[in-house]
Amino acid sequence: VIKADIALHDLSLAPSWRNGSVVVGHSRITPYAHRMLESCLVVTTDRWFLVVRERQSGTAGLAAPAGEPRAPRHVDEEAFHYLYQACVLWPLDYLMVEVARVGCRLRIRAGMLGSAPVYARATNDRITVSWDSADFAALPMALDTEVVTHRLAMHTMYAARQPYSGVTMLTERASLYVEPGKANLRYPDPVAASAPRDDRDGDDDLPAFEAALRRSAAARPVGEHATVELSGGMDSATVATVLRSLGTTLASRGILLDGEVRDTQVPRRSLIVDRLGLADATVDIAAWPPDLDMAPAGAQGFYREFYLEACMALWSSARSEGRDTLFTGVGGDELFPAYAGEGMPGAAMDPGWVGESATCAEGLLTPRAREAARSLRTFDAPAGPVPMTSLIANSCRAPDMLRHGQWPVAPLGDPQLVAFCHRLPRASRRGRELMRRYLASHLGADVFPPGYSKETFAHVLPPLIARHALSLTAQLTQCALADIGLVEPRAVLALLDTVVRTQSHGATSALANFLWLERFARQTA
């Protein structure tokens, strides 16, 4: 939630606020300006820190809205320590920049929610920080081939190391230490794995589940500027329902799919919108298809929302109405895990589909890249209070949302809610039974009956790729990932042919993953 360009020798000087930024000599730290964020600069003898954090409901104003000018708060050592501890223990997301003027030493510390991570590149005498990884494309960067290989193989990975060598993502609770000539990233201690409790006859977990939902949704002062992404699924419906139960004035936005899934998605969304009284607007995925151009305008970041074009239309629509806080259903898939030995139907993804994607992805790799992809990684971030896949989703979507003026909020990724749900007995987790009961009690049992058909984007890309097959073939006569020895060009064209012939979801997923990485890699060619 900051952008910064800091010459380390400037850290020996005193900081000041100027035009929405903290200025130190010729260096500048600029918080992301948004009504849901606040910032504060606290200064004592030879030390200071800047915190940019999510605003919390019902708290007094230590900080000013991020981006607004506010004089530094000069305090003694005792008050500095007190304020520092209060910021470190902040229950919502935050980013802290801490400076010791003696020695020009700096530490950047991230909060535990990973809502909008920042990226950093340190050299002997300078550090650059940004919430938008595309900013680093302006520099002559080299690819980290080990990271890129694992991503080509579609391995789930949440780590500080990123596709550009020397660029680090500050993962949740991580700290980056920098001083002239030295840099060191430290991961936090892992969070202990959860375990379900035994079933107890007569227990009803629904009241406690609803209370945890309400606490998470009410944690931030939303006002009248909120939008919820409403796909028509249980996760986003749960978020919309709990926000309306709190009296939140709420708009909804959704992407309408094509094909058979539309026949169930549209009426289900309509029921939710009508029963919650939402100000709704939609776009059709057919009108905003994903861009398959391998030479798009503008720099590309490390991650991308595959359906960015349709999402941008929704975000722009919300922004035009003054709505700049976007509630999402991210985290819902991770609330009700299956533990070893439990047969849990209704999993988020079919294992056969996952296996097909992995096989197709590995088939693209050269022998040396395949061996690298099969090696175990030693650089992943440890387990945290927010599930890893939720953190990955946040990192993929946040930069695009911030560019469009939207601050993302994921109530279903709240650590206390996650911990509660992960300890539920099997009967409450099976088939998301507790969430289904919650929705039935507020929306009616007809909206999400047992075994309802879930909406999916699975059928969007295959026909689109088939229509653009000739153009893609022509664009892939040159391949940056092949030039650095990671993929076999003939295997890429063979996979494209497989997608055109079969429109298989697994093959399409592997090809789409390759196309995005190839587009990104061409920036460094």
Describe these PLM feature segments.
Residues 38-39, 197, 290-295, 458-465:
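Short, solvent-exposed polar/charged micro-motifs at secondary-structure junctions
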Residues 102-105, 112, 123, 180, ...:
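ATP-dependent adenylate-handling active sites, centered on carboxylate activation for C-N bond formation
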Residues 1-288, 515:
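Cysteine-centered catalytic environments shared across enzyme families
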Residues 11, 76-80, 133, 145-146, ...:
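Alpha-helix initiation and N-capping motif
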Residues 161-171, 220, 226-227, 403-405, ...:
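Short coil/turn segments at secondary-structure boundaries
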Residues 78, 82-86, 139, 151, ...:
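Residues that form generic nucleotide/phosphate-binding pockets
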Residues 340, 348-352, 445-505:
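PAPS-dependent sulfotransferase catalytic core
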